[in-house]
């Protein structure tokens, strides 16, 4: 049976699935009915997922730099966009 993107047999989640889970975790932590212990467990899971997302984004960036180094030499930033130190931290770049 051929594997399709909709019927993946791999246990490795896509980055979109990781982000979806992070959003779910955020909603649960923000819910006042979520207990402290559960919030801590959710926070730990979220930090782990965020690190996995960061690693995958860095891998993707490296692939893009290999494909077209001239286009990825400097991060694209819209004109008059505010500085985002969090994005710089995420990718390990400077503005």
Swiss-Prot record:
Broad EC category: hydrolase
InterPro entries to which the protein is assigned, alphabetical: Exonuc_VII_S (IPR003761), Exonuc_VII_ssu_sf (IPR037004)
Presence of keyword Zinc: no
GO cellular component, one term: exodeoxyribonuclease VII complex
Domain of life: Bacteria
EC number: 3.1.11.6
Assigned keywords, A-Z: Cytoplasm, Exonuclease, Hydrolase, Nuclease
Location of region: Disordered: 65-95
Subcellular location: Cytoplasm
Molecular function per GO: exodeoxyribonuclease VII activity
HAMAP family: Exonuc_7_S
Family (UniProt): Belongs to the XseB family.
Assembly: Heterooligomer composed of large and small subunits.
The protein's name: Exodeoxyribonuclease 7 small subunit
Gene: xseB
């Amino acid at each position: 049976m051929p594997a399709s993107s909709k019927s993946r047999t791999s246990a490795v989640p896509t980055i979109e699935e990781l982000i979806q889970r992070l959003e779910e975790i955020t909603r649960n932590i923000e819910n006042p009915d979520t207990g402290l212990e559960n919030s801590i467990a959710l926070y730990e899971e979220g930090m782990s997922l965020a690190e996995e997302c960061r690693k995958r984004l860095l891998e993707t960036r490296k692939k893009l730099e290999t494909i077209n180094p001239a286009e990825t030499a400097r991060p694209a930033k819209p004109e008059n966009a505010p500085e985002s130190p969090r994005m710089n931290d995420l990718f390990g770049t400077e503005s």
